[in-house]
């Protein structure tokens, strides 16, 4: 059984693949309610990781809110316009955990990021927090 093997060109690879959001049901807000969750590009993921660190390279206090920050980054309307801003992070943290985790899990899934990647960011921030 042989499968076709096609090596793509540099030009093909450098053309961004059109992002496709994943609609996450949020029935807590009413029947049929969804939040579109968009994938992060490689550049956006790198920026997200960098935001979790201070200028000294150590995780900053904001890294504790890694899930909330991921929700801000990935939840957008049907046109890709962000639903939330960084000013909403504290309020997102007050939201029902099940809803937030659903959005976080969808963001990880569509972006190809593992939950271990996010846990590592959060763990690194814990190491710098006073006991």
Regions found by a protein language model. Give the residues of each.
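Extended acidic low-complexity intrinsically disordered regions
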Residues: 1-20
């Amino acid at each position: 059984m042989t499968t076709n093997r096609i090596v793509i060109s540099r030009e093909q690879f450098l053309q961004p693949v059109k992002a496709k959001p994943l609609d996450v049901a949020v029935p807590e807000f009413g029947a049929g309610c969804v939040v579109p969750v968009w994938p992060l590009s490689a550049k956006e993921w790198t920026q997200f990781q960098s935001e979790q660190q201070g200028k000294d390279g150590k995780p900053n206090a904001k890294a504790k809110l890694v899930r909330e920050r991921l929700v801000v980054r990935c939840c957008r309307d049907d046109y890709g316009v962000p639903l939330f801003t960084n000013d909403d992070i504290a309020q997102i943290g007050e939201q029902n955990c099940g809803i937030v985790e659903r959005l976080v899990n969808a963001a990880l899934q569509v972006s190809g990021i593992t939950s271990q990647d996010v846990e590592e960011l959060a763990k690194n921030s814990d190491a710098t927090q006073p006991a």
